[in-house]
Amino acid sequence: MTETAKRPLYVPHAGPSLLEMPLLNKGSAFSTQERIDFNLQGLLPHNIETIEEQTERAYSQYNLCNTDLDRHIFLRSIQDNNETLFFRLLEEHLEEMLPIIYTPTVGQACQEFSKIYRTHRGLFISYPDRERIDDILRSATKNNVKIVVVTDSERILGLGDQGIGGMGIPIGKLSLYTACGGISPAYTLPVVLDVGTNNPDLLNDPMYMGWRHERVSGAQYEEFVDLFIQAIKRRWPNVLLQFEDFAQTNAMPLLERYKDELCCFNDDIQGTAAVAVGTLLAACKAKGEKLSEQTVTFVGAGSAGCGIAEQVIAAMRLEGLDEAQARRRIFMVDRWGLLTDDMSNLLDFQQRLAQKRADLGAWGGQQGDDLALLEVIRNARPTVLIGVSGQRGLFSEEVIRELHRHCPQPLVMPLSNPTSRVEATPQEILNWTDGQALVATGSPFQPVQVGDRRMPIAQCNNAYIFPGIGLGVIAARATRVTDGMLMAAANALANCSPIVTRGEGAVLPALGDIREVSKRIAVAVAKQAQAEGKALQTSDEVLNEAIEANFWFPRYRAYRRTSF
């Protein structure tokens, strides 16, 4: 516990209003003196409880819920009543509850957002209010916001356009910043940009709570986002802004436009890439190989897949390959087949990853012919197969067996969310590779029984990366998030892998260890920021103290009454 946590907190609120503030409410844990000082006598049951007793009751109530969505709603209700209790409950049951507060359950919560809505959290900034964004940001009661997660809800997980229902994603992401990375909830703010929706189910739903209008696009959309960004810079000039679940056509352009203007990153592109590269590095370390020796096939060439590919290329170059050599080891397969330089329908970021058709002469096929996944596997002979397609079953038995035929121990990463959209299940992959594959998934899966072995499955979850990045940025007061900082995060994650440290187990650490993993990532990120001149230089001792000082624990502090 930090020295700050031991000191009393001076609070100007009292009575029912204090009980209605999730960041300050202790419920039945208010002491006798606090009940007197803050006019709470008679507003709470007589017995004074510890947070341990409150947590035990909350968990017993949680276990009465019948469905995962019910559990999600229950946890969110606690969060909106008492944030300290909410995060204490998560701390004690993180592996069990992480799939409930985030993927995969959060996807259903987004789809049902208007039906299960209970109370306000975060900011809803709609296009008709575009001239009042500064006023909207001023209405936020948190003056010391350090992390904002924003979405326009156009590409929520693998579910597409969810309108304002996408607010569930920033809320869930920021819950993980706190639960996994120790960022105080007082420093976080979820935001949804309501630019309309093209989802007919929402437009025709009488309960839909968002702006009933088709999505704004083009110049109007870009101007609206820029109004928001500039207002954020005025309100919180040192904030870390995370773009979340923007559509492919907007995600990369927004990142490219603003990455040198403020401290920001896109978790779908950069966070996903960092955790994927960390997973690849861990697998290579375990096999005694180099990343630069691998050949990687991607299924899904959207912004996420291409973002991972670019970071893999950057990592290969750090091991000595030149750019052309690294790019020849990357094969991107999308709905048109293998991306090649003779295709006319590729986006800019896809063109950089297209293979030269002239180099594929031995594969067969004429100019313009599609090269399907199986043909790519057969000819490229990859050692790594990564799925970010959102299409269930694309990793067929024939594909996986062909992969294994050329590589005794392939790394297979079906990363699509939610579980219903995964390219193949771990059980299928291990059955088809005689238990030899290394597997990391995007959604959580239970351990798989293969013969007499029970094999844990690593979840290639961005929660391994972004909380540590946030903690490192805040502790070092970094002004930007750079590619070097992301690579430092990936390397730190790889060094925490059980198959690296112990020679057995899953490719990634257990989620129960994620808070310590986040601290290690934070140190690596902060040091890299200092090395690149994006943060003030300090000694290692001062940096470690800053990380510990910024690491929040869900514990109640003593309160003292003060006036406004």
From Swiss-Prot:
The record marks D268 as: Important for activity. The active site is at Y102, K173. A divalent metal cation binds at E244, D245, D268. GO terms for biological process: malate metabolic process. NAD(+) binds at R155, D268, N417. Its EC number is 1.1.1.38. Its cofactor is Mg(2+); Mn(2+). One of its GO terms (cellular component) is cytosol. It holds the Pfam family Malic_M. Divalent metal cations. Prefers magnesium or manganese. Disulfide bonds: none annotated. One of its GO terms (molecular function) is metal ion binding. It catalyses: (S)-malate + NAD(+) = pyruvate + CO2 + NADH; oxaloacetate + H(+) = pyruvate + CO2. Homotetramer. Belongs to the malic enzymes family. This is NAD-dependent malic enzyme. It comes from Pseudomonas paraeruginosa (strain DSM 24068 / PA7).
